[in-house]
């Protein structure tokens, strides 16, 4: 897949510590806005059908894990990797199921602020390293952006599609479009919801509906293409 300079505005090739901090500040605001949009939601959930509170709890656990890993790496300490992601996610779902959204929000914002402090322990040269034990073969800055921006935003975007909140989906997608393509080197597959889908039939119906509302928008067309949906709907 070639970089998306021509069609999608992809320009940036790397990120600095200051830029990563700025992106984390942005996601903090958008998480709070997301919670505000769904605070009155009364949806009863289960592990295969999350509500907005489950999404926030999931993000909290992953930000905490990523932060602890980076803290261990910078101090040359051992850390325990996740051996089974499904078990990790399910255990945390059960642990947080009855926690109030106010508590979850407070903890998540705290962890994101702690994450920024950990980022500051690294150097600009460290950000370009691919040999650190993150569990991935790409640069450290890409790992940080994956865990603090890409993964959280994709969960928010999926939930917005799931609940047909297309206006907020478009706004959020637009806001993070450049950073998504920077992270993914212009590859539209960064917008694939394959690993997030709960109900594939409903997802396809809703994302096609999204496409109908924004049929002339190149960014939304790319999202549809990444999810194997014909843009000419």
What positions do the PLM features span?
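Short, contiguous alpha-helical
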Residues: 2-8, 41-87, 129-189, 194-233
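Solvent-exposed interaction patches of small proteins and small membrane subunits
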Residues: 7-11, 15, 19-22, 76-79, ...
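An N-terminal domain-cap segment
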Residues: 11-49
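Acidic/His metal-coordination segments adjacent to aromatic residues that form catalytic metal sites
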Residues: 12, 89-105, 133-143
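Aromatic-acidic/polar surface patches that form glycan- and anion
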Residues: 13, 20, 24, 48, ...
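Alpha-helical packing segments of well-folded alpha/beta enzyme cores
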Residues: 20-23, 27-31, 62, 66, ...
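A short secondary-structure junction motif
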Residues: 31-38, 73, 122-125
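Internal, conserved structured core segments that host functional sites
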Residues: 104-132, 136, 140
């Amino acid at each position: 897949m070639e970089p998306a300079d021509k069609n999608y505005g992809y320009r940036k090739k790397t990120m600095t510590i200051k830029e990563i901090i700025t992106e984390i500040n942005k996601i903090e605001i958008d998480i709070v806005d997301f919670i505000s949009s769904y605070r009155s939601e009364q949806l009863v959930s289960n592990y295969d059908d999350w509500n907005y509170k489950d999404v926030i709890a999931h993000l909290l656990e992953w930000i905490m894990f990523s932060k602890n890993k980076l803290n261990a790496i910078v101090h040359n300490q051992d850390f325990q990797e996740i051996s089974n992601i499904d078990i990790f996610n399910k255990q945390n779902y059960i642990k947080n199921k009855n926690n109030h959204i106010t508590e979850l929000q407070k903890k998540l914002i705290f962890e994101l602020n702690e994450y920024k402090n950990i980022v500051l322990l690294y150097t600009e040269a460290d950000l370009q390293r691919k040999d650190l034990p993150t569990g991935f073969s790409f640069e450290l800055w890409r790992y940080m952006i994956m865990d603090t921006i890409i993964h959280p935003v994709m969960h928010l975007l999926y939930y917005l599609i799931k609940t047909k909140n297309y206006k907020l989906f478009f706004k959020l997608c637009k806001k993070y479009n450049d950073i998504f393509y920077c992270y993914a080197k212009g590859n539209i597959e960064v917008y694939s919801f394959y690993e997030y889908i709960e109900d594939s039939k409903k997802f396809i119906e809703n994302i096609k509906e999204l496409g109908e509302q924004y049929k002339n928008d190149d960014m939304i067309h790319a999202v549809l293409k990444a999810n194997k949906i014909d843009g000419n709907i």
